[in-house]
Amino acid sequence: MERINSTLLTAFILTGIPYPLRLRTLFFVFFFLIYILTQLGNLLILITVWADPRLHARPMYIFLGVLSVIDMSISSIIVPRLMMNFTLGVKPIPFGGCVAQLYFYHFLGSTQCFLYTLMAYDRYLAICQPLRYPVLMTAKLSALLVAGAWMAGSIHGALQAILTFRLPYCGPNQVDYFFCDIPAVLRLACADTTVNELVTFVDIGVVVASCFSLILLSYIQIIQAILRIHTADGRRRAFSTCGAHVTVVTVYYVPCAFIYLRPETNSPLDGAAALVPTAITPFLNPLIYTLRNQEVKLALKRMLRSPRTPSEV
């Protein structure tokens, strides 16, 4: 599985995650179910937002629909390849496939960071400036903000992919990870990676730290505003719409910070931590938003219990 130093690699072998061989089938079935339920859950969110006129024109739920698209996409570029680790035989990933996987993961992941920030800002405007909210956050503005998040995410993903794969890869081709990510791939480079590691740390650090700081600042203002609400029902509804977002942000940011914002150690915990944003978070997001968001729950009930009659269409 090693190439001589004068030969550039044309494929990589992803070693996957370590597991007992006797549990091969169990792990395959587990991640297969995770993948299917992720797609179905996020598709249900998309259909609910699109079908309910009370939701699909509101910026908060436009953002939620985009989040579902991102979750479905991240799961699709990571989990099927991970499942191949639990089948017999070695299945290399082509060099171009590795480039594409790294690009799309960082493109979608950074877009998700920006989107979480937009969702926090939207909640800040809705709760702290409710009278001006319809003017400050219009459907047109939310669409422009989403387009900006996609564009910034694409630039971030392209930067990371170009910096990583401009280096020569001519030695071992085993990526000690379950997908092509920057730290694992850089270990195979036949050149000094100091600049790459520094740029990666700064770039991802700026994205994560700036987005998280803006989210934190928004929620400090939101909590102060909620505590000033006089009615218990008003406070409950405000916490209901914000609680789901706080939960998914926490679940997403903690493992990302653990993986990228610490010195390179090649810890066996990296793989376990990376499973959270790549497989677990996309699976949990629909559950969190349907269980903790009262408006989504009510929209689901309306859609499931009250199908439209021909006269209503």
From Swiss-Prot:
Glycans are attached at residues 5, 85. It is a multi-pass membrane protein. Keywords: Cell membrane, Disulfide bond, G-protein coupled receptor, Glycoprotein, Membrane, Olfaction, Receptor, Sensory transduction, Transducer, Transmembrane, Transmembrane helix. Its main location: membrane. It comes from the Eukaryota. It is found in: Cell membrane. Residues 47-54, 122-140, 219-238, 292-313 are cytoplasmic. GO terms for molecular function: G protein-coupled receptor activity; olfactory receptor activity. The chain crosses the membrane at residues 26-46, 55-76, 101-121, 141-161, 199-218, 239-259, 271-291. Residues 1-25, 77-100, 162-198, 260-270 are extracellular. Disulfide bonds join 98-190. GO terms for biological process: detection of chemical stimulus involved in sensory perception of smell. One of its GO terms (cellular component) is plasma membrane. Pfam families: 7tm_4. Odorant receptor. Belongs to the G-protein coupled receptor 1 family. This is Olfactory receptor 10G3. It comes from Homo sapiens (Human).
